[in-house]
Regions:
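Glycine-rich cofactor/substrate-binding loops
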Residues: 1-34, 62, 85-86, 90, ...
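A helix-coil-helix interface module used to build multimeric assemblies
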Residues: 2-217, 221-232, 294, 307, ...
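Generic, well-ordered alpha-helical scaffold segments in large soluble proteins
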Residues: 42-47, 99, 103, 138, ...
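Proline-centered turn/helix-capping motifs that create local helix->coil transitions or kinks
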Residues: 105-110, 199-202, 280-283, 318-322, ...
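A structural signal for small-residue-enriched, beta-sheet-centric alpha/beta enzyme cores
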Residues: 123, 218-221, 236, 241-248, ...
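Short amphipathic alpha-helical segments with heptad-repeat character
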Residues: 136-144, 148, 185-188, 192, ...
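Glycine-rich anion/phosphate-binding loop at the beta-strand->alpha-helix junction
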Residues: 194, 240, 246-335
Length: 456
């Protein structure tokens, strides 16, 4: 059976492959090879730029350009060659080293220093920096832009519906009204916090040898400050330096990275469920799309499938990323290999994220507020005005205001007329009575509109 989108084991590479395309060049095995090649090349160039390493003279402009070209022009043919070499070495990082030694054969200047490719490095020196570059690239070029799209869409809902009143529900029961826009603004604010946290998250790397102590480095060049050298190299890649590690970078930052994504996703899961519920309550209508079918047997159905799809995929994403966050920071003694196979799944959870984010945006695009229904529902729940009435009664010193409103309203459907009669009997200033009598469930929305306008 030939591998295709129909025969792929994972739906990420099958049914949903078009939705995860931006991640493929980053987190595929091709992507990992590409970043490994880049790290190996930059390490060789760093050695050549160091005067104390006389065995690697400074590279000519031509040699540096040749090396830069290997990185910039890395392609699938190159990746296939690395894979071919690995069939012999049974070691993926060593295959990259041998590939580079092959690649430089036409440049005598580089051939003369070929044994300094991968000099003093353990495989994890190359791998951890590659993984850091993968996550940094994915964050800046894919994840944060996707988050911004979602935030923009929900912000649009907040602004568009900021004045449309909504009967709130606490514990599923009628509560003080809000507006549709204000409920969207609550979500936007939460998402923006997570955006900033991921944007500012540290992405760490190390290059310090087999157990983190520069043993091999110092055996060859004891007079070089390898600790400083390591910092210079790691930061030159745009990565923050971790000065204290075992053989592996301990991956705490990866746990922090994915924890941030999980928090963002959890907010979106709640958002999906709330919109699902609002649709069920007829607060929102869904625009139909010609040709779409909601049920194989019930022709009338227009299901909230996009929010359901998003919720399901975010659950998968969070499960994968939570495991990464819990497993990766644990490694026996100076290292064990359990992280290796797990790290090959860095992009899996993020792939499910992309599917989910697209589904939520699609669901939002179909939404249309059912304002007549919202107003009707508010008009059937005059008891929500018990709160402002008893609060004003407290101001004017009326005895047992809460208890009197509780007796009138608790567990009852109260009419407008009953509320007006209750207000009329209150011993409060006439202007306050008039203010309360003008109040309706639809206008008792507090500062909802102003809060939306202050969101930015």
């Amino acid at each position: 059976m030939q591998l295709s989108t129909l025969t792929a084991l994972s739906p990420l590479d099958g049914r949903y492959q078009d939705k995860v395309t931006p991640l493929r060049a980053i987190f595929s095995e091709f992507g990992l090879m590409k970043f490994r090649v880049a790290v190996e090349v930059r390490w060789l160039q760093k050695l050549a730029s160091t005067a104390d390493i006389t065995e690697v003279p400074p590279f000519s402009t031509q040699a540096n350009a040749f090396l830069d070209g290997i990185v910039a022009n890395f392609n699938e043919t190159d990746a296939a060659r690395i894979k071919e070499i690995e069939h012999t070495t049974n070691h993926d990082v060593k295959a990259v080293e041998y590939f580079l030694k092959e690649k430089i054969q036409s440049e005598v200047e580089l051939v003369n220093v070929s044994e300094f490719i991968h000099f003093a490095c353990t495989s994890e020196d190359i791998n951890n920096l590659s993984h850091a570059l993968m996550l940094s690239t994915a964050r800046d070029e894919v994840i944060l832009p996707e988050w911004q799209k979602l935030i923009n869409e929900i912000t649009r809902l907040a602004e568009e519906y900021k004045m449309i009143p909504l009967l709130s529900r606490t514990h599923g029961q009628p509560a003080s009204p809000s507006t549709v826009g204000k409920e969207m603004a609550n979500v936007v604010y939460r998402l923006k916090r997570q955006f900033k946290q991921l944007q500012n998250a540290e992405i760490l790397g190390k290059i310090n040898g087999a157990v983190g102590n520069y043993n091999a480095h110092l055996s060859a060049y004891p007079n070089i400050d390898w600790h400083k050298f390591s910092e210079e190299f790691v930061t030159s890649l745009g990565i923050q330096w971790n000065p204290y590690t075992t053989q592996i970078e301990p991956h705490d930052y990866i746990a922090e990275f994915f924890d941030s994504v999980v928090r963002f996703n959890t907010i979106i899961i709640g958002f999906n469920r709330d919109l699902w519920g609002y649709i069920a309550l007829n607060h929102f209508k869904q625009r139909t799309i010609a040709g779409e079918i909601g049920s194989s047997t019930m022709p009338h159905k227009v299901n909230p499938i996009d929010f359901e799809n998003s919720e399901g995929n975010l659950g998968l994403a969070n499960t994968v990323m939570t495991h990464l966050g819990q497993k990766l920071p644990i490694s026996r003694w100076q290292r064990d290999l359990t992280d290796s196979t797990v790290l090959r799944n860095l992009g899996v959870g993020l792939g499910y994220c992309l599917i989910a984010y697209a589904s939520t945006r699609k669901g939002i695009s179909k939404l249309e507020v059912n304002q007549p229904h919202l107003l009707e529902e508010l008009n059937q729940n005059w008891e929500v005005l018990a709160e402002p009435i008893q609060t004003l009664m407290r101001r004017y010193g009326i005895e047992k205001p809460y208890e009197k409103l509780k007796e009138l309203t608790r567990g009852k459907r109260v009419t407008e007329q009953a509320m007006l009669e209750f207000i009329d009997k209150l011993a409060i200033p006439q202007e306050e009575k008039l203010r309360l009598q003008k109040l309706t469930p639809a206008t008792y929305i507090g500062a909802s509109v102003e809060l939306v306008e202050k969101l930015s």
